[in-house]
């Protein structure tokens, strides 16, 4: 495999972000959504996101999707957000708004290239990655929100839900060639070790697990909290990686970013797991496989971002933003025997039901 000839499966992640100026985005906001105000480009990976600030202080996020984005998948994301708002109106998730014609997505020509445009809520605050030491209350709040999100999505389906995405844990085996692109031999060996564990212990059981539509990307950059009092979660963002997959995968993704890197890695994540389990109890098999899935998410993070950073060196800093903590998490998990980690997860879950 070469860096620049990805299979169709990787097309969305391999495609370059669109080229749209803030002035073009401002004009689209005015013409198609009736919003007049300042426009600022925000950081992003495969899409372009613009903050629209109107004269009355109202703020919105205008998203211009990657040219490789399937309109059916975009509609899947839109309908999921509307479904969540209907099932759990108080859940702090991103909102989507219709354009002037009542549609939730529109195709706009930018310099001759057709691109999907959507409008979302913009919530003031700071992303969770900027909170230096998230306390127990915040980690518990995050676990509760993720569990509620899973409950709100239960029973939701859409023709686009079956799309394939490299960030989907159930497809982790397809990373083998990309692990070979990791230059450091020790890091490459560590990633391969945990991918082997996934294939040996978790993959054979995936089809027997509860499955539904999941958020699939609860990383700290997708969680907004209050800068002055970061205990309650203010907003969960970015539903662009949603897939239909085992429900426990959603928890594994979230826990992967809550691990401690000093001493026992799961101790730091315990409040998150307990809070989730209290609202959406894990089944015994899910508890047993959770540590394998957590490690596999970390492997996805270091492997996919390493590959994409090589493709787009100009955006390397943003693409690799979660990689250092992911490597620390993998090293910490490598020091804990699998059976010990499984016992600890069972104990964390049982403590909440005593």
Language-model regions: role of each:
Residues 1-35:
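Juxta-kinase regulatory segment immediately upstream of eukaryotic protein kinase catalytic domains
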Residues 19-29, 155-158, 174-216, 226-228, ...:
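An alpha-helical support segment within catalytic cores of ATP-dependent transferases
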């Amino acid at each position: 495999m070469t860096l620049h000839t990805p299979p169709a499966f990787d097309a969305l992640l391999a495609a370059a972000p669109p080229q749209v100026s803030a002035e073009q985005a401002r004009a689209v906001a005015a013409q198609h959504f009736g919003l007049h105000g300042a426009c600022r480009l925000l950081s992003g990976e495969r899409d372009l996101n613009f903050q629209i600030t109107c004269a009355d202080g109202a703020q919105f996020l205008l998203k211009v999707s990657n040219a490789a984005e399937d309109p059916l998948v975009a509609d899947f994301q839109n309908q999921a957000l509307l479904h969540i708002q209907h099932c759990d109106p108080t859940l702090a998730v991103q909102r989507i708004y219709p354009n002037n014609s009542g549609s939730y997505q529109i195709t706009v020509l930018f310099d001759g290239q057709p691109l999907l445009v959507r409008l979302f809520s913009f919530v003031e605050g700071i992303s969770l990655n900027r909170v230096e030491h998230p306390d127990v209350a915040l980690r518990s709040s995050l676990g509760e929100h993720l569990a509620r999100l899973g409950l709100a999505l239960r029973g939701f389906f859409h023709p686009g839900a079956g799309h394939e995405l490299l960030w989907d844990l159930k497809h982790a085996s397809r990373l083998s060639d990309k692990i070979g692109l990791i230059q450091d031999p020790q890091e490459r060996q560590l990633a391969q070790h945990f991918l082997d564990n996934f294939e040996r212990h978790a993959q054979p059981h995936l089809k027997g697990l509860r499955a539904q539509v999941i958020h699939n990307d609860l990383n700290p950059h997708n969680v907004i909290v209050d800068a002055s009092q970061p205990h309650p979660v203010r907003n969960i963002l970015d539903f662009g990686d949603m897939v239909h997959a085992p429900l426990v995968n959603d928890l594994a993704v979230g826990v992967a970013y809550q691990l401690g890197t000093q001493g026992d890695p799961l101790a730091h994540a315990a409040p998150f797991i307990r809070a989730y389990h209290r609202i959406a109890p894990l089944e015994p098999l899910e508890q047993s496989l959770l540590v394998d899935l957590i490690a596999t998410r970390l492997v996805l993070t270091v492997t996919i971002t390493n590959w994409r950073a090589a493709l787009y060196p100009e955006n390397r800093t943003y693409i690799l933003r979660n990689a250092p903590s992911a490597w620390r998490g993998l090293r910490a998990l490598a020091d804990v025997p699998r059976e010990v980690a499984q016992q600890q997860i069972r104990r964390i879950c049982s403590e909440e039901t005593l």
